[in-house]
Amino acid sequence: MPQPESQPQMLIERLGLLPHPEGGHYRETYRSTTKVATPRGERCASTAIVFLLTAGQCSHWHRICADELWLHQGGGGLLIHELSPAGAYRRTRLGLDLAAGETPQHLVPAGHWFGSEPAAGVGWSLVGCTVAPGFEFVDFSLARPEDLAPIAAAFPNWRRLCLATEPQVLPRLSPPATQA
């Protein structure tokens, strides 16, 4: 049995995870062959990834043009921060400790800004994310500070999750090479 501190590295290696442009590590595990029409063009009906965040990492504020269902798969709780198009802030704790208020799955609706991070004291969190219609990098936007102004008072640390304030990281924002 691996030591807790080696668990994330073992997951990265065994699951074949790659760095994700929004933070953390991921691997696409499913891409539907069924196509659907959307206002942005044809998309796969659904896609899925496994996604790992470790202590000190975060999924930077971003939004996509489709619903995204988050499912807790391992490790500790994960905080999902969300800003609706109307400016309402919501925080959800994803995990399996129902007595502590965690939920095993959470839907982030299309068009919401959101970011995530392991809860305080959590070493790592592994989740599955399913997007419908399917994810395409062309439908992915990283937040700028002005996009998140409505939550500045309610969530004073929002800038910590905002990649757009860290231009040295932006060159990573390109879709991963498709593996055959």
Give short role names for the model-derived ranges.
Residues 1-106, 115-116, 122-123, 133-136, ...:
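Non-catalytic, conserved peripheral segments adjacent to functional cores
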Residues 111-112:
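Extracellular beta-helix/beta-solenoid repeat scaffolds
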Residues 130:
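Histidine-centered acyl-transfer/condensation active-site motif
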